[in-house]
Amino acid sequence: MSDLDVVRHNRPAHHATVQATVLKAMIDLMGEVDKFDTFSYFLPTCPFVDAEDIRRGSSLLPRASSVISMTLMSETILLACVMSGDNVLPIFDNLECGLTNSKFIKKYYKPSGAFYMGWWDYLLEYENFFKGNVRGVVIPPERSVDINTIEDIKYAELLL
């Protein structure tokens, strides 16, 4: 990597705790480096994103406050319930109304963990990628593997 103009930033100890958030670490980092027009963060735990995904995200940024990589949720949240002991507590009205056919339930997406992009000044002002005119780039599931557990590592190894 010596031929690349890359500066490694080691996260301070207070940003390497269970309570610390990536967003807070990024905002603090922005205060320590030279200012740019935009700030983009690529999470190392989502290594299968490709250059075309990043280009698609960058192309949306001129018309947005921020751009976030997204992936389709395999299970719809509208079928979610809370369990209290053995009591089932439906969260959404559709379960009580018998509307459970997933073919007719709206699809939901979640951040894939691959990247977050935003305008520098906007991020410093709002400290949030989800405020304003937020755009999403849908990344296919095979490139949206967010590796956080040993099971995720095993799944990622199967993809290699």
Language model features with spans:
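Catalytic donor-sugar/metal-binding loop of nucleotide-sugar-dependent glycosyltransferases
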Residues: 65, 125-145, 150-160
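Short hydrophobic "helix-edge" motifs at membrane interfaces and signal-peptide entry regions
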Residues: 2, 35-36, 109-110, 138-140
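Short, well-ordered alpha-helices that flank and scaffold nucleotide-derived cofactor binding pockets
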Residues: 31, 59, 158
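Conserved core of the sugar-phosphate nucleotidyltransferase
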Residues: 18-24, 47-132, 138
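A short SAM/SAH-binding and catalytic strip from SAM-dependent methyltransferases
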Residues: 44
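Short phosphate-binding loop-to-helix
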Residues: 2-40, 48-52, 56
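Short loop/helix-cap segments at secondary-structure boundaries that form the rim of catalytic
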Residues: 1-3, 127-128
